Amino acid sequence: MAQPRIGQRVIVDVPATTANLGPGFDCLGAALDLNNRFAMRRIEGGGERFELIIEGSEGSHLRGGPENLVYRAAQRVWKAAGLEPVALEARVRLAVPPARGLGSSATAIVAGLMGANALVGEPLSKEKLLELAIDIEGHPDNVVPSLLGGLCMTAKAASQRWRVVRCEWTSTVKAVVAIPSIRLSTSEARRAMPKAIPVSDAVVNLGALTLLLQGLRTGNGDLISDGMHDRLHEPYRWRLIKGGDQVKQAAMDAGAWGCAISGAGPSVLALCAEDKGMAVSRAMVRAWEAAGVASRAPVLNVQTTGSHWQPADDE
């Protein structure tokens, strides 16, 4: 195992994720077929040097430097492998907009981990990368499906070991993700939540989560509709999203089975049958337009393969 050559380059594709899906707060997430692409290469210089090049206007506020999430994740790999840090450049084709509830920070973490690991011959297993990703992010619901793909339920067992269960999401269930031009930080969304919740609310969520998972497995719209309800976080977060209630109602009126805040928001996730996808998409965009917010609402599939890397020619 050796340090990467100057100019050595890898390309890492990392999917967007939608977390919580209503009742699965901080434990349930799914990868979507919308990817950020990171072209990472070693450049001249020692550790603490990281250059970031963003393709796309959404990331104009993002900066390089040693505190960047991509580079912080890369440093964790090198430390675990017993290697000294090296200077890196990342050129990012940004399709997952930041601060929209689609796991953009998870894509940065996973790309940094996977890219750095690939550059030094993959000394760390995927299980170790997963452990590092959760530790950096602080919660598993985005980084786990971002790395592994599909619909993932993650929980910390009594042994303190993270356990991941891949759940089935039938292809007949489509995800419409309405992505607004407004932003909402995860920290702000978390501050809106209470420190404690009633036991009755926790019980409702446990039942709803069971119904939702069965509905996603079978494509049963009634189960999805009954399961896509939450009392832990959404009652406190919808008020932070301008026009959010109207967007949710528009999606339901257009035929969606259920609707939820995607991650911490402000994007809104609607689940529906394939033949309802475009109608739900148009209705959500119109509702946000009426609230004075520009948006787009792609109809997406669940991405089942997760993140992957490929070698690229040296530069």
From Swiss-Prot:
> Gene3D superfamilies this protein is in?
3.30.230.10, GHMP kinase, C-terminal domain (3.30.70.890)
One example GO MF annotation:
ATP binding
- Pfam families found in the cross-reference section: GHMP_kinases_C, GHMP_kinases_N
The primary location reported for this protein is cytoplasm
Highest taxon of the source? Bacteria
- Give the enzyme's EC designation: 2.7.1.39
Q: Name one GO cellular component term.
A: cytoplasm
Q: Which GO terms describe its biological process?
A: threonine biosynthetic process
Reactions accelerated catalytically: L-homoserine + ATP = O-phospho-L-homoserine + ADP + H(+)
Q: Give the record's pathway.
A: Amino-acid biosynthesis; L-threonine biosynthesis; L-threonine from L-aspartate: step 4/5
Where it sits in the cell: the answer is: Cytoplasm
Query: What InterPro entries does the database record attribute to this sequence?
Result: GHMP_kinase_C_dom (IPR013750), GHMP_kinase_C_sf (IPR036554), GHMP_kinase_N_dom (IPR006204), GHMP_knse_ATP-bd_CS (IPR006203), Homoserine_kinase (IPR000870), Ribosomal_Su5_D2-typ_SF (IPR020568), Ribsml_uS5_D2-typ_fold_subgr (IPR014721)
Which UniProt keywords are present, listed alphabetically?
Amino-acid biosynthesis, ATP-binding, Cytoplasm, Kinase, Nucleotide-binding, Threonine biosynthesis, Transferase
Q: What does this protein do?
A: Catalyzes the ATP-dependent phosphorylation of L-homoserine to L-homoserine phosphate.
Family, as annotated: Belongs to the GHMP kinase family. Homoserine kinase subfamily.
Q: What is this protein called?
A: Homoserine kinase
Per the UniProt record, the lineage of the source organism begins with:
Bacteria, Bacillati, Cyanobacteriota, Cyanophyceae, Synechococcales
